[in-house]
Amino acid sequence: MDLAAVVLAAGRGTRMKSRRPKVLHRVAGRPMVGYVMEAVREAGANRIIVVAGYGHEEVAAVVNELGGEVVVQEPQLGTAHAVLQAEEKLADHRGQVLVVCGDTPLLRGETLSKLAVRHREADAAATVLTAFLDDPTGYGRVIRDAAGRFVRIVEQSDGTPEELAVREVSTGVFCFAAGGLFECLRRISPDNQQGEYYLPDALIVYLKNGLTVSTCPVEDPAEIYGINDRRQLAEVERLMRSAVLDYWMGEGVTVVDPASTYIDRAARIGRDTVIHPSSFIEGDSVIGEECEIGPNARLVRARLGDRVSVQYAVVLDSTIGERTTVGPFAYIRPGCEIGAGVKIGDFVEIKKSVVGNESKIPHLSYVGDAVIGEKVNVGAGTITCNYDGKKKWTTVIEDGAFIGSNTNLVAPVTVGRGAYVGAGSTIRRDVPPGALGVARSDQKNIPNWETRIRHEKKDNRQNNDK
């Protein structure tokens, strides 16, 4: 099947009240135009042309990364005019052309495949994807004759009361035979209240020339739900999120409270993992089997091995090995590689660091720009002092080292294999393997301090009373 697709994405989306092009607003972690491109590709489209307008450079950056091409519609004179902008790109195309809207992220590839099949079976010049809606407000109505044959599509602003009472609507999705399409579009006139060139008017041109226009109903009208404002964006997000959660529960993942769980479409989760309430799994995060996520966890582009626990914690752009526990109240910043069997405890922040297998950073520590070996113990209150005001420096803690509580490691510095650092130390020079490093002032005890303080307080009170 020689199938191309034109995605209409030129509108600014004024009701969104946003500087961002409408089709780049995200649903379940992806720009909505990405879902539409995925759907037409699943339907068999081997070439995807996206018609952009407002913010076309931003749109092109996303579309090109997803394997599509962009043409610019300027000025924006309607949907037929938009499709005409793809003429040069499709000059040699001889098959079929799908035309879809870039703001319908729930549209499925299976539905578009059925549309293309119906189009071929009917030997039609054009086929319209239609839907029956309880409230068709805002959609073009499908008008038929007494025999049920397609006659035309009437836009909301142009319809009579009788026409606007029709519940069958055009979804804005079409399949055209490429031959003659652009010639047909050039014959359309802007005879409507908006003064625009409407794509549905091409159907009238076809019918006047004795060509066939067929229709294909969509099974689930939710698929054609378009996004024009923030409320609709939230509703589509809800529908998409529900579908994603339903899929993963069907794949053996426990979601304790779907109402408070957010999983992006690109995420991957292993079986027997449990997702607790108020958890967010974003981007292309990958979670292994038998993990415990949450409650109150946020994972962004994270890679987790099997049997990892993340509770009340944030993990960003980092890798965590199997059997590791993170949290509560831990913060794993981008660029971290955490090994297997590691403990990252409460109020620990790690940034751009490597932590070896079976090491422990149990609580109240900052580890930045560090390389920590295997079976290292980092005591409470340990700080890697990695920044001198101009440059970030590396701290190295080799295998089996023991760092006492309340320690400052002033980078660049290395604590050797099996070495110890005494609690309360500020380490500025390397500690050799197997050695004990201690760097702190000697303790000084002042006798009778409590008695002295008590007398000073009494004298102060007497002076204040005078």
Curated annotation (Swiss-Prot):
Organism: Desulforudis audaxviator (strain MP104C)
InterPro entries: Bifunctional_GlmU (IPR005882), GlmU-like (IPR050065), GlmU_C_LbH (IPR038009), Hexapep (IPR001451), Hexapep_transf_CS (IPR018357), MobA-like_NTP_Trfase (IPR025877), Nucleotide-diphossugar_trans (IPR029044), Trimer_LpxA-like_sf (IPR011004)
Cross-referenced PROSITE patterns: HEXAPEP_TRANSFERASES
HAMAP family hit by this protein: GlmU
Any Pfam family the entry gives: Hexapep
This enzyme's EC code(s): 2.7.7.23, 2.3.1.157
Reaction equation(s) it catalyzes: alpha-D-glucosamine 1-phosphate + acetyl-CoA = N-acetyl-alpha-D-glucosamine 1-phosphate + CoA + H(+); N-acetyl-alpha-D-glucosamine 1-phosphate + UTP + H(+) = UDP-N-acetyl-alpha-D-glucosamine + diphosphate
GO biological process: cell morphogenesis; cell wall organization; lipid A biosynthetic process; peptidoglycan biosynthetic process; regulation of cell shape; UDP-N-acetylglucosamine biosynthetic process
Family: In the N-terminal section; belongs to the N-acetylglucosamine-1-phosphate uridyltransferase family. In the C-terminal section; belongs to the transferase hexapeptide repeat family.
Domain of life the protein comes from: Bacteria
Annotated stretches, region: N-acetyltransferase: 252-466
GO MF entry, a single one: UDP-N-acetylglucosamine diphosphorylase activity
Keyword terms: Acyltransferase, Cell shape, Cell wall biogenesis/degradation, Cytoplasm, Magnesium, Metal-binding, Multifunctional enzyme, Nucleotidyltransferase, Peptidoglycan synthesis, Repeat, Transferase
Binding residues for acetyl-CoA: 380, 386-387, 405, 423, 440
Cofactor(s) needed: Mg(2+)
Active site: 363 (proton acceptor)
SUPFAM superfamilies: Nucleotide-diphospho-sugar transferases, Trimeric LpxA-like enzymes
Cofactor note (record): Binds 1 Mg(2+) ion per subunit.
UniProt KW NADP keyword: no
Region (Linker): 231-251
GO cellular component: cytoplasm; membrane
Binding site for Mg(2+): 103, 228
Protein name, per record: Bifunctional protein GlmU
Region of interest called Pyrophosphorylase, as start-end residue ranges on this chain: 1-230
Binding residue positions for UDP-N-acetyl-alpha-D-glucosamine: 8-11, 22, 73, 78-79, 140, 155, 228, 333, 351, 366, 377
Complexes and interactors: Homotrimer.
The protein's annotated pathway: Nucleotide-sugar biosynthesis; UDP-N-acetyl-alpha-D-glucosamine biosynthesis; N-acetyl-alpha-D-glucosamine 1-phosphate from alpha-D-glucosamine 6-phosphate (route II): step 2/2; Nucleotide-sugar biosynthesis; UDP-N-acetyl-alpha-D-glucosamine biosynthesis; UDP-N-acetyl-alpha-D-glucosamine from N-acetyl-alpha-D-glucosamine 1-phosphate: step 1/1; Bacterial outer membrane biogenesis; LPS lipid A biosynthesis
